[in-house]
Regions:
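N-terminal ordered "arm"
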Residues: 1-44, 197-233
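Short, surface-exposed beta-strand/loop "edge" segments at domain boundaries and coil↔beta transitions
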Residues: 12-16, 57-60, 181-183, 207-214, ...
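Acidic, aromatic-enriched beta-alpha/helix-loop junctions
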Residues: 30-60, 64-66, 226-252
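Acidic, low-complexity intrinsically disordered segments
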Residues: 62-69, 73-86
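Mature extracellular/secreted ectodomains of secretory-pathway proteins
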Residues: 84-137, 269
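Acidic, proline/glycine-rich low-complexity IDRs
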Residues: 132-211
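Conserved small/polar residues in nucleotide/adenosyl-binding loops
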Residues: 261-270
Length: 270
């Protein structure tokens, strides 16, 4: 899944527009950030880019148009959406966003971790399948063959529909099943998420007990620097750095786990 975001500086419309591909490819990351900075936008923390237009497979994101956005939040959201493996998850995310009227970036990011809890009916012609999908949703997407064989999907669907709690949206009829929006994203520290398998995974903290920021290496230079800024780290010498995982042999992992006092973060030189 690829999207394109057309961004501008709301304080300087004369600077024109810049189109960013989402998720941002590693080999384009530094160049894109430099281009945004040249237009006096693209701060690591501030929502200083105006979303003029977004093009892609998620019409619900049109509600971000005309609003200020943060480029790293936008990139993370695009990566999360790219992880959705089927049309059902797309409908769950977009339907829940309409049902709960979410349009804030933090809410949309958190919704990617929660939308799997809602049931969305997009086709009422096969109630047996509707009931089976609803049962799977209620059980975290898992069910044994025996459970499914013994399930009366038609009756399960009728019971759901008869409750009358469905919200009609352009993406289907949404039944929230008591969904509680996850709060894993606090507006600053992105939750752990492996978009691409990294060679090395680290966490950094401003101090012991502070929220963790995840680093997936190798990564573009500016992405690492911006991640440290989001973590609140002014001087890298003062940060708490922890080894989490790697694709290196076990012997190398043992060495990496011993000490990070003099570690230089590797970067992607593409």
């Amino acid at each position: 899944m690829r999207m394109n975001a057309v961004l501008s500086n709301p304080k300087h419309p004369e600077y024109g527009q810049f189109t960013v591909p989402l998720p941002i490819p590693h080999n384009q990351y530094d160049g894109i950030m430099e281009a945004l900075n040249a237009m006096d936008m693209g701060d690591p923390l501030a929502r200083d880019c105006q979303m003029d237009e977004i093009l892609g497979e998620y019409p619900i994101l049109k509600r971000l148009e005309g609003k200020p956005v943060n480029i790293d939040e936008l990139d993370y959201l695009a990566k999360r959406l790219d992880s959705f493996c089927c049309a059902l998850e797309d409908a769950q995310f977009q339907g829940a966003a309409v049902s709960y009227d979410y349009s804030d970036m933090a809410d949309l990011i958190n919704l990617t971790f929660s939308c799997q809890e809602v049931t969305v009916i997009t086709d009422f012609s096969d109630l047996e399948q509707v009931g089976r999908e609803h049962f799977m949703v209620l059980n975290g997407g898992c069910a044994s063959k025996e459970e499914l064989d013994n399930l009366d999907g038609y009756e399960t669907a009728l019971l759901l529909i008869d409750e009358g709690d469905g919200v009609v949206t352009p993406y289907g009829v949404v039944y929230d099943n008591g969904m509680c929006l996850s709060q894993v994203y606090d507006g600053r520290h992105f939750p752990q998420y492996f978009y691409e398998p990294p060679l090395l995974t680290l966490t950094v903290q401003e101090s012991k007990g502070a929220p963790q920021t995840w680093l997936y290496l190798p990564a573009p230079d500016l992405q690492i620097k911006r991640s440290l800024i989001r973590a609140g780290i002014v001087d890298p010498a003062d940060m708490e750095l922890s080894f989490q995982a790697s694709e290196f042999p076990d012997a190398v992992d043992c060495v990496l786990a011993v000490s990070y006092t003099h570690l230089t973060l590797p970067t992607n030189r593409e």
